Amino acid sequence: MEKHGPPEHAAYPIPQADYQGSQGPYPGPQGPYPGPQGPYAGPQGPYPGPQGPYAGPQGPYPGPQPGYPVPPGSYAGGDPSGFPVQHQPAYNHPGGPGGTPWMQAPPPPLDCPPGLEYLTQIDQILVHQQIELLEVLTGFETNNKYEIKNSLGQRVYFAVEDTDCCTRNCCGASRPFTLRILDNMGREVMTLERPLRCSSCCFPCCLQEIEIQAPPGVPVGYVIQTWHPCLPKFTLQNEKRQDVLKVVGPCVVCSCCSDIDFELKSLDEESVVGKISKQWSGFVREAFTDADNFGIQFPLDLDVKMKAVMLGACFLIDFMFFERTGNEEQRSGVW
């Protein structure tokens, strides 16, 4: 009798005689899937959030979002990147550009006049005279203004000349003046007084000098011109008018595409301990303005009062040799 159905294949095993096929229909999973054990109740009670309401830092910062780590206690607001602010905004008094950062005030050491603590941690000062547009266009002499910076470009002081209009335009560069030096809060920390003196080497009895007061009204030193037929020389004195250091300049003070150095020397003039440099500012600035740039270098451990006296020497040198008023040409020599 012929067998019907699919042909047998050698690869498939022959079912046993009592093979009943599949054991009934596939029962599927053992009963319906129970799912989670009861409905999900969520967290046990409402999430309490941080312990107590977070007030956030002082200022417009709204505080962290839920789940965001709490900033450290010293956090005082930040920039968009979230980093703490390293420098607090400082008061920009009139006349000073607002974009220049101020140097942070260090702790004042003992026996340091108030306001001079900035000078205890630096060995270099940059003095930049500001360009006055009215003076450039009309030749009308205005009060000089200076930015005083450290080697990092941070502003340490701001200096403003306080002289009446008649004195500025009649006496020119030989004029007496009061220079007020302000800190980042606009407080006057130093006052420089230059009396009216003769500017010719033919009268050695009435030479130039400037008094440095810190705080205002309390002299801390003097810069006295020393007579010499060829060289510009100055003596730096302390508050008791005792000689401490000397400043010696070149024979011909000509700023032609190079810096001019006035060396800071010991009293015997044997060793050089620093210098005051008139820096070349470029042809256009040198030719059409009297806005000069200076660099002052001194030992880091120099007495802070003598550092202030060196700053006064820089201003006296500027007025004596590099100040131009009205239609006068900038001086190219010592006398």
From Swiss-Prot:
The record lists the catalysed reaction(s) as: a 1,2-diacyl-sn-glycero-3-phosphocholine(in) = a 1,2-diacyl-sn-glycero-3-phosphocholine(out); a 1,2-diacyl-sn-glycero-3-phosphoethanolamine(in) = a 1,2-diacyl-sn-glycero-3-phosphoethanolamine(out); a 1,2-diacyl-sn-glycero-3-phospho-L-serine(in) = a 1,2-diacyl-sn-glycero-3-phospho-L-serine(out)
Q: Where in the cell is it found?
A: Cell membrane; Nucleus; Cytoplasm; Cytoplasm, Perinuclear region
Q: Which residues carry this modification: Phosphothreonine?
A: T178
The keyword Lipid metabolism is assigned to this record: no
In chain numbering, where does the motif Nuclear localization signal fall?
274-283
* Cytoplasmic side of membrane: 1-305
Transmembrane ranges, per UniProt, are: 306-322
Region listing for Disordered, in residue ranges:
1-102
Q: Which GO terms describe its molecular function?
A: calcium ion binding; CD4 receptor binding; DNA binding; DNA-binding transcription activator activity, RNA polymerase II-specific; enzyme binding; epidermal growth factor receptor binding; lead ion binding; magnesium ion binding
Question: Where are the residues of the annotated region 7 X 7 AA tandem repeats of Q-G-P-Y-[AP]-G-P?
Answer: 23-71
Look up the record and name the cofactor or cofactors this protein needs: Ca(2+); Mg(2+); Zn(2+)
- What function is annotated for this protein? Catalyzes calcium-induced ATP-independent rapid bidirectional and non-specific distribution of phospholipids (lipid scrambling or lipid flip-flop) between the inner and outer leaflet of the plasma membrane resulting in collapse of the phospholipid asymmetry which leads to phosphatidylserine externalization on the cell surface. Mediates calcium-dependent phosphatidylserine externalization and apoptosis in neurons via its association with TRPC5.
Do you know which PANTHER family this protein is assigned to? PHOSPHOLIPID SCRAMBLASE 1, PHOSPHOLIPID SCRAMBLASE-RELATED
- State the domain notes: The N-terminal proline-rich domain (PRD) is required for phospholipid scramblase activity. The transmembrane domain is essential for membrane insertion, phospholipid scramblase activity and proper calcium-binding.
**What is the name listed in the Swiss-Prot or TrEMBL entry for this protein?**
Phospholipid scramblase 1
Species of the source: Rattus norvegicus (Rat)
Gene field: Plscr1
